Amino acid sequence: MSATSPITQDVVTFPRKLPEGGKRNLVGLTRPELAEALAAAGTPEKQVKMRVNQIWQWLYERGVRDFNDMTNLAKPYRALLADQFEIAVPEVVSRHVSEDGTRKYLVRIAGGHEVEVVYIPEEDRGTLCVSSQVGCTLTCSFCHTGTQKLVRNLTAGEIVGQIMIARDDLGEWPLPGRNPKNETRLLSNIVLMGMGEPLYNFEAVRDAMKIAMDPEGISLSRRRITLSTSGVVPEIARTAEEIGCMLAVSFHATTDEVRDKLVPINKRWNIATLLDALRDYPKASNSERITFEYVMLKGVNDSDEDARRLVELIKGIPAKINLIPFNEWPGAPYERSSNNRIRAFADIIYKAGYASPIRTPRGEDIMAACGQLKSATERARKSRAQIAAETGLG
């Protein structure tokens, strides 16, 4: 199958229709979409551009959720907006804080579906791990999240809404007499490494990230946004052209035989095809390098030979290799490589001239670590459902 073949998923998802008589959500609309919506609502043509700028700043620079708080708009115009539109973000169902400061939010979106969002504080940055789909279609054998079937894609509003609720919790919207732009940002980076494959939901992810990068709003540099893909080859060049963010690749193996088992998408776009697509990305996107993510699995992909083969495979690609200790989960078919084995693997890569940081697991005590998202929640709810069925209370 060629690298330009149409992309398909196990589950076909369709955009959700607006309920009869429902209001359109302004969160997630691009500037052109917002202009079109305001014009259709009766905004005079000569005022549309000005109104877009005003509303955009209220939504994404100040975090306002009530049209009545948009004080530089006339009251009749605020009433018109409130009559036809809403400002809606995902509902926070639960919030857990790890011993290491990691925060995990379970959020509910349209249709009653739930996804998880993780905030990871560090000394020099604060990173938000964002989801792009409900469930996942990739079935990577080492990832617990991948055992959960794909339900649907998230909308651009549901994706950017995750950023907004995290800023709510962190208190990072302006208050009278305070300008957060003059302060160290608590939420400074975004990684599209939550539930789902971002490149299987390209348009919504692109629009959400464009909103996050807009200098008149959330204003995050594209260098502070990293999109992680398992290797959807046909969309990689498009990502460079239309988003231009940093790119991470879930690589995890140095032979097709092993990667076919760990990351089944490799059966469609193998290692050679993937690497060919990646070689042009740093130049096309004006990004410094590509991050190769490599989960360390005992006796599977952690030998010295694997390390040397990895270095040979990526030769010529500006890159760093993130080594990820496997986050074990009940029933997992793999074990974490020993610390000594991981360090030896990292040393081979480092001596070949590549940065090879070993990721420190974060949020394990609240099931917020890599590959664990939503798993504990689903297990708990399944258990409650089983109990209810057994007792006749379901």
Swiss-Prot record:
GO terms for molecular function: 4 iron, 4 sulfur cluster binding; metal ion binding; rRNA (adenine(2503)-C2-)-methyltransferase activity; rRNA binding; tRNA (adenine(37)-C2)-methyltransferase activity; tRNA binding. One of its GO terms (cellular component) is cytoplasm. [4Fe-4S] cluster binds at C136, C140, C143. InterPro entries: Aldolase_TIM, Methyltransferase_A, RlmN_N, RNA_MTrfase_RlmN, rRNA_lsu_MTrfase_RlmN/Cfr, rSAM. It is found in: Cytoplasm. SUPFAM superfamilies: Radical SAM enzymes. Binds 1 [4Fe-4S] cluster. The cluster is coordinated with 3 cysteines and an exchangeable S-adenosyl-L-methionine. S-adenosyl-L-methionine binds at G196, E197, S228, S250, F251, H252, N327. It holds the Pfam family Radical_SAM. Residues 122-365 form the Radical SAM core domain. Reaction proceeds by a ping-pong mechanism involving intermediate methylation of a conserved cysteine residue. Specifically methylates position 2 of adenine 2503 in 23S rRNA and position 2 of adenine 37 in tRNAs. m2A2503 modification seems to play a crucial role in the proofreading step occurring at the peptidyl transferase center and thus would serve to optimize ribosomal fidelity. Belongs to the radical SAM superfamily. RlmN family. This is Dual-specificity RNA methyltransferase RlmN. The gene is rlmN.
